[in-house]
């Protein structure tokens, strides 16, 4: 099947053409980072308006890059949620209009499910596996039995890891988005310079909490103004990043060991972080676990990742049809309960 995928859940407008749910023919992403940087974060109304301005151009470019006419498309997958309601509706309305005009099926897929399954565009990952989905809006651990069968085993109780990165960057005066910049500065710092807390790390569960860590960094920089300059800033970034990564690895290690599932997927925007990738690789080697992390392009928001679940659901006649609407809050467990969508 030649599938057109459309992603507009937050601040990237993306479209992709994928063959048979695995072969990427094009993957186009239009970012709004420079627009939202002036506000220090994503402004939902602005994001929606930019999606409206950009989505047709992005789809046309995806088709051009794939060297295909729109008439060759056999199905459409679109992000249904979770995400910003207005942003989601831009993608959904576009997908439904195209599907209606072309007389082809359309399916709404889960954004986090797509992140978790994106690795299948690059690697042959067998089920079951443990998945850590870690991004600006989510930090969750799942047991994944098959496409459409997910069980949440742990989640953040407050801030997501990516949210913590961006908030800490903002309080230190770093430009938005701050996560990638913290990663770069951390590479030049000493991760042992400052002993920041590791919230919930020693509790007997798989949940996360990062708000206390964020507050600890805030208190430190207020008491130590000199920490905002030069090598001292690098040390703060390195110490903060080390704390986040240690918690993520510790909880994931516990889930892998206690479940007996020695196969792990790390997905989402924070999976681009070099420290997390390194620490996860070290843990996996020590425990004899298979580790799969997508390439950075497939970790950040994109449309190609929708093709893995989208192709599966369409080929198995699990399609939303034209009644699909936005689900700004859409837990993966709900997919399992409804047999797909």
UniProtKB/Swiss-Prot annotation:
It is an enzyme of class 2 (transferase). GO terms for biological process: tRNA threonylcarbamoyladenosine modification. Disulfide bonds: none annotated. GO terms for molecular function: iron ion binding; N(6)-L-threonylcarbamoyladenine synthase activity. It holds the Pfam family TsaD. Keywords: Acyltransferase, Cytoplasm, Iron, Metal-binding, Transferase, tRNA processing. Its cofactor is Fe(2+). CDD domains: ASKHA_NBD_TsaD_bac. It is found in: Cytoplasm. GO terms for cellular component: cytoplasm. Binds 1 Fe(2+) ion per subunit. It catalyses: L-threonylcarbamoyladenylate + adenosine(37) in tRNA = N(6)-L-threonylcarbamoyladenosine(37) in tRNA + AMP + H(+). This is tRNA N6-adenosine threonylcarbamoyltransferase. It comes from Geotalea daltonii (strain DSM 22248 / JCM 15807 / FRC-32). The gene is tsaD.
């Amino acid at each position: 099947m030649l599938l057109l995928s459309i992603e507009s859940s937050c601040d990237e407008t993306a479209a992709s053409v994928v063959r048979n749910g695995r072969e990427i023919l094009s993957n186009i992403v239009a970012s709004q980072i420079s627009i939202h940087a002036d506000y220090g974060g994503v402004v939902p109304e602005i994001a929606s308006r930019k999606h409206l301005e950009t989505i047709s151009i992005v789809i046309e470019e995806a088709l051009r890059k794939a060297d295909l006419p729109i008439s060759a498309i056999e199905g459409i997958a679109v992000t249904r949620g979770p995400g910003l309601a207005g942003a989601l509706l831009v993608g959904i309305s576009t997908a439904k209009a195209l599907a209606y005009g072309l007389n082809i099926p359309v399916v709404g897929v889960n954004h986090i499910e797509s992140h978790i399954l994106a690795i299948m565009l690059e690697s042959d990952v067998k089920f079951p596996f443990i998945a850590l989905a870690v991004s600006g809006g989510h930090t969750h651990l799942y047991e994944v039995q098959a496409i459409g069968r997910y069980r949440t085993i742990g989640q953040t109780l407050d801030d997501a890891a990516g949210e913590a990165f961006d908030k800490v960057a903002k309080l230190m005066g770093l430009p938005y988005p701050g996560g990638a910049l913290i990663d770069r500065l951390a590479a030049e710092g000493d991760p042992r310079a400052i002993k920041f807390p590791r919230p919930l790390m020693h509790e007997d569960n798989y949940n996360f909490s990062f708000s206390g860590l964020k507050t600890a960094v805030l208190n430190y920089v207020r008491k130590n103004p000199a920490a905002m300059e030069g090598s001292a800033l690098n040390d703060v970034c390195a110490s903060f990043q080390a704390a986040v990564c240690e918690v993520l690895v510790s909880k994931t290690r516990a889930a892998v060991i206690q479940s007996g599932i020695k196969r792990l997927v790390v997905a989402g925007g924070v999976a681009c972080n070099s420290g997390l990738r390194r620490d996860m690789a070290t843990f996996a080697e020590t425990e004899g676990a298979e580790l799969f992390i997508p390439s950075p392009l497939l970790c950040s928001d994109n449309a190609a990742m929708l093709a893995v679940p989208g192709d599966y659901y369409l080929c198995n006649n699990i399609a939303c049809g034209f009644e699909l609407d936005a689900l700004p809050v859409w837990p993966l467990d709900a997919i399992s309960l409804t047999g797909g969508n």
